[in-house]
């Protein structure tokens, strides 16, 4: 129970929702996590290899700050140098069918998973490289 001003209660409610406190169907999300742990671990190395493929392609670019050796999972986060704009890049690649996210104004996050095969990662790498060259 929280007793406070209206402002603090509203703020606490926002924090609760941000942390998942408003979820009513948490079991559905938990079920997908269990499936991932029980059935998908055998192919996890493919996701990691695909992430490494993306990292190697991007790590060669002078506009990108990324050490491919640091990519150990299926997540690739890279930083744009100079006049880079992460949101502009995310928008540009989205228009060409590649989903990415921003992590601040200069950093972009890519995630590989079982629905993204090697050929798709190769296409995504080419699209991201071309977009960076066009934008920056």
Regions found by a protein language model. Give the residues of each.
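Active-site C-terminal subdomain of aminotransferase-like
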Residues: 1-81
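Alpha-helical scaffolding segments of alpha/beta enzyme cores, especially the outer helices
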Residues: 7, 49, 53-56, 88, ...
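A common structural junction motif
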Residues: 20-21, 94-101, 128-136
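Extended hydrophobic-aromatic, low-complexity segments
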Residues: 43, 87-89
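Short amphipathic beta-strand starts and helix->beta connectors
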Residues: 58-64, 92-99
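Conserved PLP cofactor-binding pocket of PLP-dependent enzymes
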Residues: 69-71, 75, 97-112
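Basic, amphipathic alpha-helical recognition segments used for DNA target recognition
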Residues: 84
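PLP-dependent enzyme catalytic core of the Aspartate aminotransferase-like
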Residues: 88, 106-136
């Amino acid at each position: 129970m929280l007793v406070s001003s209206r402002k603090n209660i509203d703020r606490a409610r926002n924090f609760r929702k941000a942390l998942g406190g408003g979820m009513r169907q948490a079991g559905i999300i938990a079920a997908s996590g269990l499936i991932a742990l029980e059935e998908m671990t055998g192919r996890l190395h493919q996701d990691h290899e695909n992430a490494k493929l993306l990292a190697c392609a991007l790590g060669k670019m002078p506009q990108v700050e990324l050490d491919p050796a640091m990519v150990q999972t299926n997540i690739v986060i890279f930083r744009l140098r100079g006049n880079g704009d992460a949101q502009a890049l995310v928008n540009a690649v989205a228009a060409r069918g590649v989903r990415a996210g921003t992590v601040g104004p200069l950093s972009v996050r890519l995630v590989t998973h079982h629905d993204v095969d090697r050929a798709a990662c190769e296409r995504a790498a080419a699209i991201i490289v071309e977009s960076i060259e066009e934008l920056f």
